[in-house]
Amino acid sequence: MWLLGLFCGLSLFLLGGCGGGGGGGGTPYPVDRAVSVTNKGNYYEIVLNYNEGFSPFEVGQEYGRKVLATVPGYESALDSYLAELAEKTDFLYQLFLSRAEEIRKNLDATYVEELEGFADNLITENKLGDGRLSVDEFFLLNLVPDVARATACNALAVWGNRSVTGKTQLVRSLEWFSGSQEQLSRVNAVTVVKNGTRSYAMVGYVGMLGMLTGFNSRGVFAAVLDSQTGSEYSYTGCRSYTFDLRRAVENAATLSDVADDMRNPQRNYTVNHLIFLADGREAWVLENNFRGLGTNVSRRVRTANSETNPGFNPGIAWGIDESIAAVNSFVLLGNTDNHTILPANAMRWSSLATQLRLAGEQVTGTELKSVASYSSTGKPGNRDQGDLYSTHTAQLLYFCPETLELEAFFRNPSVAAPLPDKPTFQAVPVTF
């Protein structure tokens, strides 16, 4: 009897002293509940739940486990994508890995833990094009915007009297190299990070945890656009601007919060870029110009009033009130002129203005989406000819910051027919 009592007491002690798995003692449920990965047809809905006290490593680890179990051919697709970025040469492959290793040192600790958790599911050996994703390759994948540049984008917003709702409406186009086999198109993703009042969503790709496009539960929207100036690439001591943008949006209550964070002179980035910002009342463009030629190269915010003060560089005009646009160029007076000399920028800017004027004095959501879908050929066109919907379009988004209404068009994973003649937007529910 004494032995039976001791056994029962010991059993109760062991059962009572163990947590629910992954979250430590006292967690209400296993870490399995920290992450969901749901196939929505042409994109994956990812939910990373920090509301129950799971650590970044635990969330990342569960995310990686579920991706490998849920997303067919994930490793082979992304490994081959990285090989194509490196032009299948070991020289570029090693160069990109070394760049990523340097930038990785300057990531916020929370994001490093999350990435390391995901990578805990991967192999450690680096081998170009082996069909497996290694730890270092996964970090490289997440730092592609900082390491290997091959993108183009545009964005447009209207508000006030120019918007039929009186509130901000915007469209954003992401034009990325999707891979010769549409590798990225297979892993389109909308990732929702649930973290109390600091919850936010990111539109991008499965496993990529920097912010290309995103918004928080307070209606602050941000999106990145490249703006190369021809200046020498430098990565020593640099940070990742997509991960810094994630942190800024996560903590922001206003557009100024994001802009001030991202233009902090203490933070060095590999390349010049733009941040398209919007809330329910207006939209801005942060011109993060820190290298290049110009009479006043600087990191400044452009608003709807900037055309008159301080003005635009010679040869650039917009002239449409209560609206703002961005392509892959700086336009503020004194910043590097990578606009008038590059047809893809000047022509797309002109198309945005022309199509917006054709929409009339008050713009509906349907009309704004039509502007974003413009092509002179009636099918995916050429950026250099001013086509906004081009053969490189990867994602098209329509968003209302006031209501958090999101609609999206995602490039198809079909190599034979990745894009229809006209994009069709679908509602994308986001719940915080």
Regions found by a protein language model. Give the residues of each.
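Bacterial N-terminal signal peptides that target proteins for export
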Residues: 1-5
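Intrinsically disordered/low-complexity terminal segments and short unstructured peptides
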Residues: 10, 26, 210-217, 302
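Bacterial Sec-dependent N-terminal signal peptides
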Residues: 10-33
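Glycine-centered flexibility sites
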Residues: 19-20, 60, 166, 219
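C-terminus-biased signal that marks the final domain/tail of proteins
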Residues: 26-152, 249-432
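Internal mixed beta-strand/loop scaffold within catalytic domains of large alpha/beta enzymes
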Residues: 140-244, 397, 406-408
